[in-house]
């Protein structure tokens, strides 16, 4: 049985470096697009990035998911317009960006071990990923505005939307797995 959704979709094929590079590029494109689908909050905009980050981890696994997020962070660092705000790793959202890498890698590690194939395991993996992203984001933001403000500006407003994104993933991932097994 294939460990990740990407491997399952490519089953019967030797997964080449070209396919892996293509997956990374598609993943970074999805992240860049999702960064610009936003509801403008300050200092942290609400985007679809967290959903895409977790889906990348769940679909690609730890290694390819981490490679995708490292590539994305490099793209933003060298000036490509892929981040939600121009400040990127120098601004108030830096903790979230680093949290994206950690969350995608951990969710990918869980996916490598079979999480994400059922509603329950998807829920567990994605809640862990969300805690990492919001925790690291708020931790960095707290160095700028204090812990109480970081929680009220960088966590609490996002909880309802993150819940909806997790529910969407809980419906989508097991369905994709059923499709991939055919």
Segment roles from a protein language model:
Residues 1-59, 63-66:
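Hydrophobic transmembrane alpha-helices
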Residues 65-72, 79, 83, 103, ...:
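Alpha-helical transmembrane segments and their lipid-water interface positions
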Residues 35-45, 71-103:
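Interfacial aromatic-anchored transmembrane helix boundaries in multi-pass membrane proteins
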Residues 115-182:
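Membrane-embedded alpha-helical hairpins and interfacial helices in multi-pass inner-membrane proteins
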Residues 21-26, 51-55, 65-71, 93-98, ...:
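Hydrophobic alpha-helical transmembrane segments
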Residues 2-12, 19, 26, 33, ...:
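Short helix-perturbing small/polar motifs within transmembrane alpha-helices
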Residues 33, 37, 59, 78, ...:
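Helix-loop junctions at the membrane-solvent interface of multi-pass transporters
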Residues 14-16, 42-47, 87-95, 123-124, ...:
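Interfacial loop-to-helix junctions that mark the boundaries of transmembrane helices
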């Amino acid at each position: 049985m294939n460990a990740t959704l990407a491997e399952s979709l490519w089953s019967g094929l030797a997964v080449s470096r070209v396919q892996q590079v293509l997956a990374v590029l598609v993943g970074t494109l999805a992240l860049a697009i999702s960064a610009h689908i936003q509801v403008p909050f300050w200092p942290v905009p609400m985007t679809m990035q967290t959903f895409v980050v977790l889906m990348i981890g769940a679909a690609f696994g730890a290694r390819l998911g981490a490679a995708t997020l490292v590539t994305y962070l490099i793209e933003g660092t060298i000036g490509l317009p892929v981040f939600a705000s121009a400040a990127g790793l120098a601004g108030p959202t830096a903790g979230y960006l680093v949290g994206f890498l950690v969350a995608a890698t951990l969710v990918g590690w869980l996916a490598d071990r079979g999480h994400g194939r059922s509603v329950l395991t998807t829920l567990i993996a994605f809640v862990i990923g969300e805690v990492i992203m919001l925790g690291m984001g708020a931790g960095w933001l707290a160095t700028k505005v204090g812990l109480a403000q970081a929680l009220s500006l960088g966590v609490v407003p996002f909880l309802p939307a993150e819940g909806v994104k997790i529910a969407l993933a809980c419906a989508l991932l097991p369905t994709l797995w059923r499709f991939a097994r055919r």
